[in-house]
Amino acid sequence: MKEAVKNVKPKVPAKKRIITGSKTKKKVFVKKKPPDKKPLKKPVKKTVKTYKLKSIYVSNKDLKMSKWIPTPKKEFTEIETNSWYEHRKFENPNGSPIQSYNKIVPVVPPESIKQQNLANKRKKTNRPIVFISSEKIRIYPTKEQQKILQTWFRLFACMYNSSIDYINSKKVVLESGRINVAATRKVCNKISVRKALKTIRDNLIKSTNPSIMTHIMDEAIGLACSNYKTCLTNYIEGQIKKFDIKPWSISKRRKIIVIEPGYFKGNSFCPTVFPKMKSSKPLIMIDKTVTLQYDSDTRKYILFVPRVTPKYSVNKEKNSCGIDPGLRDFLTVYSENETQSICPIEIVVNTTKNEYKKIDKINEIIKTKPNLNSKRKKKLNRGLRKYHRRVTNKMKDMHYKVSHELVNTFDKICIGKLNVKSILSKANTVLKSALKRKLATLSFYRFTQRLTHMGYKYGTEVVNVNEYLTTKTCSNCGKIKDLGASKIYECESCGMYADRDENAAKNILKVGLKPWYKQK
């Protein structure tokens, strides 16, 4: 019994409160009050906001369009491309005849019209507005000529950097982020900058033998002023968050100099320095400023000569199409008379497989061996650029050939606008890195740029259409359906059975034609 009593724990007393003030401290025991019981709140029902999807459906009757859309199981006829990609076509057996009309081409882009009008106002002339496109001419300088050109590239970059430093010293953009308007009018003027930097320019010219032309150095000052102005406009319009114009590094990959048309004489430029110059095309009929570019990777000297293309009439067909860019096929084209599928993604993967293997190997070497020599690093980086250039050249070849064919067959093209920037961002964890790489190689944004340029050149209107609900909407009845990962769109209300990409291409065409139809 005594052992059992020993194991029992003694009772712990309540907390003590010590009252001070007198010499003797009195110990007072205070009992804790039980907590007040609060009335229980009734559970509040959370209301979930429901948003109705805005329908993009346009009926076939409104656009005078047929209900025709091919079934997924069909036999395509292949089109010769003279390149690495595939181009297949399926024709509508009940297609209507296409009307033709004459159109004067090329069409001058609105941005070019605006720039030419501003130039006419500034120079107080009435020059006609023309379509300008650049022509590439490769030159083959000798070793002595290459040495002279390399020094000229270096001096051009030095003059550009010194002019930008001078403009920055005048505090055009304040530390608070505000722009000093009075300073921009005075400083961002090439004549005032030229006067201020006359001594620096003359010293740079005297430092070389044979000396560089003064007008070429003046072009560097003019280029710096124009680049500064464009950076300011981008900052004002909110396209750039922080104003920052960086100077050129002398050892950069691509170097340029700007040459005036007066220096081109006798199938060469600057005949006092370069009496003879080999070129891929004759250097004649040059009446505008030309830029000479040197690429250190390819070791090529290329002249970009602006040419005016004269206007002429072309027989165009009244035929419009919708294009859905995607990952199964690069492009899916729909028109009332035919559908086309251009370059399946499997072919892109197979053609770029070897290049990406070598790129991954080089990247692994750079990551695993950080303490490499500078020469070794330069070689590895040059190899990276080489294999990336091969991939871009393949895509460039496909872009130009596809856009040329589309522009010649259709008079209006409605293409879906993909937000590739948000898809390729690090925040997007849904897509895998392999899919992101495929999207990056296809480069849809560059394709749309090239297609619009070709459209202006050959008289075809190109419209960018938002892809909102184009895949989910039935092109026949307008019912919205979640497809998920299925490749076929099967409508439950009207019974339409078609390929999902072709259905999306038809919806893109309808949305693109909607404002055009209302204007008519």
Curated annotation (Swiss-Prot):
Matches recorded under InterPro entries: Cas12f1-like_TNB (IPR010095), Recombinase/Transposase-rel (IPR051491), Transposase (IPR001959), Transposase_put_HTH (IPR021027)
Pfam families attached to this UniProt entry: Cas12f1-like_TNB, HTH_OrfB_IS605, OrfB_IS605
Gene Ontology molecular function terms on file: DNA binding; metal ion binding
UniProt KW Transmembrane keyword: no
Keywords, comma-separated and alphabetical: DNA recombination, DNA-binding, Metal-binding, Transposition, Zinc
Residues at which Zn(2+) binds: C474, C477, C491, C494
Bilayer-spanning residue ranges: none
Positions of the UniProt region annotated as Disordered: 23-44
One Gene Ontology biological process: transposition
PANTHER family per record: PTHR36172, RESOLVASE-RELATED
Family designation: In the central section; belongs to the transposase 2 family. In the C-terminal section; belongs to the transposase 35 family.
Protein's name in the database: TnpB-like protein L770
Species for this entry: Acanthamoeba polyphaga mimivirus
